[in-house]
Amino acid sequence: AKEAGATHAINASEVDPVSALRDLTGGGATDVFEAVGSEKALGQAYSATCKGGRTITVGLPSPGSELRIPALSLVAEERQLLGSYMGSCIPKRDIPRFLELSREGHLQIDVLNSRFITLDQVNEGFDALAQGEVARQIIKFDI
């Protein structure tokens, strides 16, 4: 995360991420993004959001996943829970901007890629993705 520009990183296997984020921010973050796609991670993200804050999920949960949150907190604490499919990207608008940010050194794209694979490795690539061994892979085409 720090390689990609994060100022802080919390290892959820070492500490309670909700408590750590609430301590770090003095009561919760204004915007919390969940990118894993698990209801546990989304619940933690919501719990780490401050009053008046937004929890944004870009992670794709498995079918049948359900989220339980204190419903009153949405209204009484004026929180927002937002879903964003594929980052709500508009490719024609956003990809040129992402490339510009990358060229300027403001967006570290390389750290988001776990590995390069060839087209004949695509099935192994999907298996590795399903097993959680990689986050992103780029297919290299020999043309």
List the model feature ranges, each with a label:
Residues 26, 37, 50, 130, ...:
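Short conserved AdoMet
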Residues 53-56, 69-111:
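Rossmann-fold dehydrogenase core element
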Residues 40-41, 64, 89:
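Short glycine-rich, flexible loops that bind phosphorylated cofactors or substrates
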Residues 39-51, 57:
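Rossmann-fold NAD(P) dinucleotide-binding segment
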Residues 1-44:
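Adenosine-nucleotide cofactor-binding segment
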Residues 15, 61-62:
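Flexible glycine-rich beta->alpha loop in the catalytic core of nucleotide-sugar glycosyltransferases
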Residues 10, 30-35, 58-60, 84-87, ...:
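Glycine- and other small-residue-rich loops at beta-strand/loop junctions that grip anionic moieties
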Residues 15, 43-47, 92-143:
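C-terminal hydrophobic helical "lid"/dimerization subdomain
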